[in-house]
Amino acid sequence: MTAPVKLAIVFYSSTGTGYAMAQEAAEAGRAAGAEVRLLKVRETAPQDVIDGQDAWKANIEAMKDVPEATPADLEWAEAIVFSSPTRFGGATSQMRAFIDTLGGLWSSGKLANKTFSAMTSAQNVNGGQETTLQTLYMTAMHWGAVLTPPGYTDEVIFKSGGNPYGASVTANGQPLLENDRASIRHQVRRQVELTAKLLG
């Protein structure tokens, strides 16, 4: 019997959209037969800033039982999904801070040949969603990872906004739309399937 693909979903979320996307990705991974670790990156924002936003405080409480990602989690993984909201056209400082802890794994080649895809969200359609995904993929390219963006491999990509780089959601404080959820499911299922093929 073939061992399940080891999938790490590493996310940052301030007000809940990213957490919802990561949960959807985790469910899709399990449905595809993967062993899944759902992991948040460490919060680095000052507490007084967080306390000034009710949605942020509520989301931190909702995520309290989600373990924090470590380099060891990425060493374990065979497939990696990063999810970060857009901040000024790139990933959040919290996600970048986590990425900056991975130098040891990178220098020893332990991130090479893992599959990688990415997801993001922003408050508006032109809020830097594509550039955020591209910068995350650029990081994975430095690792020697195998990029597995969804492209236009399913009709749902067009229905959810047409982003070939990865699932991207225009956040408005509401639950994820079904097309967004379906796009995430397709992306993760495809990545798990491709990873299994690469592992032989």
UniProtKB/Swiss-Prot annotation:
Give a Pfam family name: Flavodoxin_1
Residues forming the Flavodoxin-like domain are 7-199
Q: Which residues bind FMN?
A: 13-18, 86-88, 121-127, 142
The enzyme's main class, written as a single word, is oxidoreductase
| Reaction catalysed by this enzyme | a quinone + NADH + H(+) = a quinol + NAD(+); a quinone + NADPH + H(+) = a quinol + NADP(+)
Any idea which UniProt keywords this protein has? Answer: Flavoprotein, FMN, NAD, NADP, Nucleotide-binding, Oxidoreductase
Q: Which cofactor does it need?
A: FMN
- Specify whether NADP is a keyword of the entry: yes
Q: What is its EC number?
A: 1.6.5.2
The keyword Glycoprotein appears for this protein: no
Co-factor binding comment: Binds 1 FMN per monomer.
This entry carries the following GO cellular component terms, namely: membrane
- Judging by the UniProt lineage, the source's domain of life is Bacteria
Q: Which SUPFAM superfamilies match?
A: Flavoproteins (SSF52218)
The protein's GO terms of the molecular function aspect are:
FMN binding; NAD(P)H dehydrogenase (quinone) activity; NADH:ubiquinone reductase (non-electrogenic) activity; NADPH dehydrogenase (quinone) activity
Q: Which InterPro entries match?
A: Flavodoxin/NO_synth (IPR008254), Flavoprotein-like_sf (IPR029039), Flavoprotein_WrbA-like (IPR010089)
Please describe the quaternary structure of this protein: Homotetramer.
Q: Which family does it belong to?
A: Belongs to the WrbA family.
PANTHER family assigned to the protein according to its UniProt record, in alphabetical order:
FLAVODOXIN-RELATED PROTEIN WRBA-RELATED (PTHR30546), FLAVOPROTEIN-LIKE PROTEIN YCP4-RELATED (PTHR30546:SF23)
What's this protein's name?
A: NAD(P)H dehydrogenase (quinone)
Organism of derivation = Deinococcus radiodurans (strain ATCC 13939 / DSM 20539 / JCM 16871 / CCUG 27074 / LMG 4051 / NBRC 15346 / NCIMB 9279 / VKM B-1422 / R1)
